[in-house]
């Protein structure tokens, strides 16, 4: 049995994730006038471009909501963001610049907390503003049904009647005006922006063209560091972790992780840290392009990774990164609370993050230009005296020890030469004078 309703369920309670923007405002009013009983739910995610959250539910009531609730999701959002950081759950990167999955994390929190609030009100039909081409329609679908197995989905943007009557922003604005609401469309930007306190996503419209770059974006969490007119002074910042949790910035301890992240955003944002331009594969395997901001998470992640590399051994780091990529993809797909994701996340939190205690000092400059100045931790396994080029007392190994270790390597070197010779005999390899490959013709060098 399908859980998606193609037409408006008149006479029934319908919950809508209400942002207060034109789309959801027109949809709420339209649903009320067509005979549904709309309930509005707004997630407070600490969006940097939202000036007044308390006003949003009031507007929803004006547009016909039976009830309107503001759900504070900030603490849970930051908790999930730090969990993703601890596990390195980021699979999209370009030349070392990372997308911190800030929108997928936000959807995991919104999709569960709003549906839980609806369930408390006896609302078992949910609508939101996601379109059929994007990732969010599937993310919200999964999280909604995980939270409420009796949930039905109604999306105005999948209802042909709604599309025929209010198919565009101009039509929506006129509809609101005729209903007596002086709702003026905001000025059209050259791209679309979605944000929460973890980060911002800029995409669509002009940004669908790869010839349009970061220079057309006006950052909402930082500064346009690519503009020479923007003055940015170098700044030193110290980040402290205790058992994987960020607890202090520049010596100031924060009992509330939300306040710590806000300060990290302010520090990183002054430099434009954490902005990246990514081409990615959506859930449906079509490629899309986005420009992202995440100044606070970027700052914390740099410090966290520095401590990871100084504390853990190579095999642990390799496993952490492999699992992090897998977990990042699951998060992106809307599977953050699936069993395989929980297994990967909790493994990293237990065996990687719990050892991460220490301080890292950085110098931030413009954009993603920074230097690591100092790393301190009681758990460091980095010990410079082990490999010092100077003469040291009680050296951990001697020249004779290294001779023995190198001699043992003869076994795999001989094996490698024999395999290369086999490849030459079968024609897979053809060494030439200009090749860096050893000149193996008869099994001898």
Curated annotation (Swiss-Prot):
Principal EC category: ligase
One annotated Gene Ontology cellular component of this protein: cytoplasm
Enzyme Commission identifier(s): 6.3.4.5
Pathway, per record: Amino-acid biosynthesis; L-arginine biosynthesis; L-arginine from L-ornithine and carbamoyl phosphate: step 2/3
Subcellular location: Cytoplasm
GO MF annotation, one: protein homodimerization activity
Keywords: Amino-acid biosynthesis, Arginine biosynthesis, ATP-binding, Cytoplasm, Ligase, Nucleotide-binding
Highest rank taxon of the organism: Bacteria
Residues engaged in binding L-aspartate: 131, 135-136
Signal peptide feature range: none
Swiss-Prot/TrEMBL GO biological process terms: argininosuccinate metabolic process; L-arginine biosynthetic process; urea cycle
Binding residues for ATP: 17-25, 43, 129, 131, 136, 194
Binding site for L-citrulline: 99, 135, 139, 192, 201, 203, 280
Reaction catalysed by this enzyme: L-citrulline + L-aspartate + ATP = 2-(N(omega)-L-arginino)succinate + AMP + diphosphate + H(+)
One Pfam match: Arginosuc_syn_C
Membership in a protein family: Belongs to the argininosuccinate synthase family. Type 2 subfamily.
NCBIfam families linked: argG (TIGR00032), PRK05370.1 (NF003779)
Assembly information from the UniProt record: Homotetramer.
Name this polypeptide is given: Argininosuccinate synthase
Organism the protein comes from: Bordetella pertussis (strain Tohama I / ATCC BAA-589 / NCTC 13251)
């Amino acid at each position: 049995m399908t859980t998606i309703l193609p037409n408006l369920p008149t006479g029934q309670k319908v919950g809508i994730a209400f942002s207060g923007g034109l789309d959801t405002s027109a949809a709420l009013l339209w649903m009320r006038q067509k005979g549904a009983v709309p309930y509005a739910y707004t997630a407070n995610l600490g969006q940097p471009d939202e000036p007044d959250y308390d006003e949003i539910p009031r507007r929803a009531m004006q547009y016909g909501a039976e009830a309107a609730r503001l759900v504070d999701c900030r603490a849970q959002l930051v908790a999930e963001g730090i969990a993703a950081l601890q596990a390195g759950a980021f699979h999209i990167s370009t030349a070392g610049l990372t997308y911190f999955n800030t929108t997928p994390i936000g959807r995991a929190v919104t999709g569960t907390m709003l549906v839980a609030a609806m369930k408390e009100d006896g609302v078992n039909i949910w609508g939101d503003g996601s379109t059929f081409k994007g990732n969010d329609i599937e993310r919200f679908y999964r999280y909604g049904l995980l939270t409420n197995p009796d949930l039905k989905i109604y999306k105005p943007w999948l209802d042909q009647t709604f599309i025929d009557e209010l198919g565009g922003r101009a039509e929506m604005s006129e509809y609101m005006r005729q209903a007596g609401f002086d709702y003026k469309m905001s000025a059209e930007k050259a791209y679309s922006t979605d944000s929460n306190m973890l980060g911002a996503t800029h995409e669509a419209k002009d940004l669908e063209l790869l010839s349009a770059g970061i220079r057309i974006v006006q950052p909402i969490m930082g500064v346009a560091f690519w503009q020479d007119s923007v003055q940015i002074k170098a700044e030193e910042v110290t980040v402290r972790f205790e058992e994987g949790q960020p607890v202090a910035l520049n010596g100031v301890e924060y009992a509330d992780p939300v306040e710590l992240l806000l300060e990290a955003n302010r520090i990183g944002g002054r430099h434009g840290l954490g902005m990246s331009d990514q081409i990615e594969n959506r859930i449906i395997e079509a490629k899309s392009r986005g420009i992202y901001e995440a100044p606070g998470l970027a700052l914390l992640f740099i410090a966290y990774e520095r401590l990871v590399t100084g504390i853990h051994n190579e095999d642990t780091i390799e496993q952490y990164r492999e699992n992090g990529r897998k977990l990042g993809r699951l998060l992106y797909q809307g599977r953050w609370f699936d069993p395989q994701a929980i297994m990967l996340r909790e493994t990293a939190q237990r065996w990687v993050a719990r050892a991460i205690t220490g301080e890292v000092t950085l110098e931030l400059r413009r954009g993603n230009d920074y230097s690591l100045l100092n790393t301190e931790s009681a758990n460091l396994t980095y010990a410079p005296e082990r490999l010092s080029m100077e003469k040291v007392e009680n050296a951990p190994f001697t020249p004779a020890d290294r001779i023995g270790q190198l001699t043992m390597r003869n076994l795999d070197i001989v094996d490698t030469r024999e395999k290369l010779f086999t490849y030459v005999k079968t024609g897979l390899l053809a060494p030439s004078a200009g090749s860096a490959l050893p000149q193996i013709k008869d099994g001898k060098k």
